[in-house]
Amino acid sequence: MRTFFVSLVGIGFLLMSTQNDAAAGETMLLETSQGQVEITMLPDVAPNHVARITELVNEGFYDGIVFHRVIPGFMAQTGDPTGTGMGGSGSKLTAEFSDYEYRNGTVGMARSSSPDSGDSQFFICFDGCGHLTGQYTVWGQVENGMDTVQKLAVGEPPAEPDQIISAKLVD
């Protein structure tokens, strides 16, 4: 009986550590109409946002969604199925503000004037985003592909917006 109990506890710890390692090492791969973008998700900074983004990616939510707002020197925004900047998945998130500094390639959750209105829309910063630190939830950092983000069609919305062809999670 003791051996069974020890084995059961050991399996439990193994499962818990596997889940934590998978979440911490998760990379979101965006295949866009301009190329690939690799985003390292930051569950230690925004665990609830990373969990929600993971759900949306696994559901295929982001596949086919356009970059509806691209402002040179500031950011590129996506995640709205209507392409207007007004839509979302229908599930609001409580803000997880941090002191993680917004810089080139930082990925943040878009929201309205209400701090707890983040849903599915997110933005990728170019350079002029430092003032957003502590004001918008950071959940990722682009590791590869900022050259791709820089190629996205500009506008609010762009006349011919680029899109996310597919989004998936990779190790």
Residue ranges and their predicted role:
Residues F5-V6, G12-D171:
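Cyclophilin-like peptidyl-prolyl cis-trans isomerases
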